[in-house]
Swiss-Prot record:
Annotated ranges, domain Peptidase S1: 25-249
A biological process from GO: proteolysis
Quaternary structure and interacting proteins, as annotated: Monomer.
Family listed: Belongs to the peptidase S1 family. Snake venom subfamily.
Descriptive protein name: Alpha-fibrinogenase
Entry annotation: catalytic residues: H65 (charge relay system), D110 (charge relay system), S204 (charge relay system)
Keywords tagged on the record: Disulfide bond, Fibrinogenolytic toxin, Glycoprotein, Hemostasis impairing toxin, Hydrolase, Protease, Secreted, Serine protease, Sialic acid, Signal, Toxin, Zymogen
E.C. numbers: 3.4.21.-
Pfam families: Trypsin (PF00089)
Propeptide boundaries: 19-24
Entries under PANTHER family matching the protein: KALLIKREIN-1, KALLIKREIN-RELATED
Places the protein is found: Secreted
Signal peptide range: 1-18
Length: 258
């Protein structure tokens, strides 16, 4: 009953959505119901919306800037107006950040690891996604997904998550467009040159999936979204593998790479 009430609130949020949220897929298509079994929705009653990725039965990976009070985490969700029988709602038992004060920048440490209050079982619409065994190759075709806005600057939230394929680009492409980026960072630059395809408001924290592994976390991009085909910036998960695995193993004092 609680889950039904919350989903009703989410539907109302879509009907009345104004000018708030955090990053959605522009230029994509509705995901197939079985294409996003690891995708999590992070939500609270104020209407803050983000994505996340289930990486094992009790842990979700998202972006640090997606942290919110009274966070609710939905797994196995496809259509806001038509609940799946196996979808689950969880809350955060603990949240971990690279720095204790949750300090991050547009090019560094925008990563959050969430321990769920209860485990979830693999089911028809729920399954964890593997961490990367290697960094993604240049020009790899990867998939993004989320419930973010499908239009920009005016925001339009979909009832089902949207998916799109984008490409890993050279880091200097993002650096040339976003002059504030340093010479090196633990991020990935991804998009489709000269095409308006990419993440937008409400997609932040969601996955960049390459060859069945989570390689990136949607972090930030242009405003309006994918303006003139501008690529997005994604936290490079491979660089944080050791930190993630250490935290999950119980070493809560583990530190992120410098």
């Amino acid at each position: 009953m609680v889950l039904i009430r919350v989903l009703a609130n989410l539907v109302m949020l879509h009907l009345s959505y104004g000018e708030k949220s955090s990053e959605l897929v522009i230029g994509g298509r509705p995901c197939n119901i079985n294409q996003h079994r690891s995708l999590a929705l992070l939500y609270n009653s104020s209407g803050f919306l983000c994505g996340g990725t289930l990486i094992n039965q009790q842990w979700v990976l998202s972006a640090a800037h997606c942290d919110m009070e009274n966070m609710q985490i939905y797994l196995g969700l496809h259509n806001f107006s038509l609940p799946n029988m196996d979808q689950k709602r969880r809350v955060a038992e603990e949240k971990f950040f690279c720095l204790s004060n949750k300090s991050y920048t547009k090019w560094d440490k925008d990563i959050m690891l969430i321990k769920l209050n209860r485990r979830v079982k693999t089911s028809t619409h729920i399954a964890p996604l593997s961490l990367p065994s290697n960094p993604p190759r240049l020009r790899s075709v990867c998939r993004i997904m989320g419930w973010g806005s499908i239009t920009s600057p005016r925001e339009t939230l979909p009832y089902v998550p949207h998916c799109a394929n984008i490409m890993i680009l050279r880091y200097w492409v993002c650096r040339a467009i976003y002059g504030s980026l340093p010479a090196k960072s633990r991020t990935l630059c991804a998009g489709v040159p000269r095409r308006r395809i990419g993440s937008c408001l409400g997609d932040s924290g969601g996955p960049l999936i390459c060859n069945g592994q989570i390689q990136g976390i949607a972090s930030w991009g242009s405003d309006p979204c994918v303006n003139h085909g501008a690529p997005g910036v994604y936290t490079k998960v491979f660089d944080y593998n050791d930190w993630i695995q250490s935290i999950i193993a119980g070493n809560t004092a583990a530190t992120c790479p410098p």
